[in-house]
Amino acid sequence: MKRETIALHAGYQSEPTTKSAAVPIYQTTSYTFDNTQHGADLFNLDVAGNIYTRIMNPTTAVLEERVARLEGGIAALAVASGMAAITYAVQTLVEAGDNIIATKTLYGGTYNFFAHSLPRQGIEVRFIDPAKPEEIAANTDSRTKLVYCESIGNPAINVVDIPAFAQTAHAQGLPLMVDNTVATPTLFRPIEHGADIVIQSLTKYIGGHGTTIGGAIIDGGKFQWAGNPRFEKTFNQPDPSYHGVNYCEHFGAAAYIARARVVPLRNTGAALSPHSAFLLLQGLETLALRMERHCENALKVAEFLKKHPQVEWVNYPALPDSPYKALIDRDYGGKASGLLSFGIKGGREAGAKFIDALQLFLRLVNIGDAKSLATHPATTTHRQLDDAELAVAGVSPDMVRLSVGIEHIDDLLADLAQALDAAKA
């Protein structure tokens, strides 16, 4: 099936008892066992079925199936937020004393987690230039466990060469983990380009309406955990925390996503609610249609800003003079999603005046909403970073980030024009 069809039909046929055409909301904590042996078999992971909604739920399972198939993976794990997905994706692979490699240009929450929280857990994060995959080898040692990047960075709006990163990571025996939130699987599937694990903040474009927090981890199913000395203890030996299961022996290609479910999710509990899963399924159904308008509007906004005398610079990867245009054309079909950034003449003060003058664009820190959104990253999403960290993350004091929605383009341009005029005063 094509991606547009997967988003509507994968993982569900009408429910056998009620014949419900819509995916039901299974608002339950627990599931009955046929008998004692059935319960034991479920806990041993010997049979398929549901145990407890902290670990799995039938509504959430449909969402997981659809997201996995959209990204071209073999399975997915949906959790309570995008940050929970990032946390669990990393924790599935690391322990105290390990290190990971990550690009410098990351979402502010991710950068803060990597730079400050992981080190307190005994995990070192080695930051590299997102344009230099060769730095992976120079930062790899025997305790390195993964390489992490964003396909399209937020808010730097840089584009990473995923095939080059994958090739270099694999040469070191490392999996490549890619946050694909900004691109979405509608525009780009990292797994098809060599990535092993994909992260989605379902809160953003997939949910699409600013109503629901959620995240997902997608397993590409291609990385060789078996026989890899970096992951001997993690996947190839009995796990005393879960009935002595050997993940590679028991789950084969799905060893990674199985461990993510029964170790970090089971033990720390950032479970997605069934009702949230239902709302995210509604958003997913129209993802392809919305992304067409997001991309169309964002390009027109970028072109408008590029010509405006009050604007110092514009960063949108689909612009002809963007340093990322070649990658967007090669890997994304020429479309660069709905996120862009720009700088206003007058710096931070003018940027604040611009933000305050907006009448249609909403002043908030989410992205991927059907409505257009604006924020000043240096004082919001990246406020916790000092000046040096801001520079490393690619966030300048004058940067304004726009998440361009699906409204009529004439209304969006009119709002931007009047706000830019107000910024001159």
For the regions a protein language model found, what residue spans apply to each?
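Conserved N-terminal alpha-helix of the aminotransferase class I/II PLP-enzyme fold
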Residues: 35-87, 109-117
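N-terminal "arm"/small-domain region of PLP-dependent enzymes with the aminotransferase-like
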Residues: 1-57, 65-66
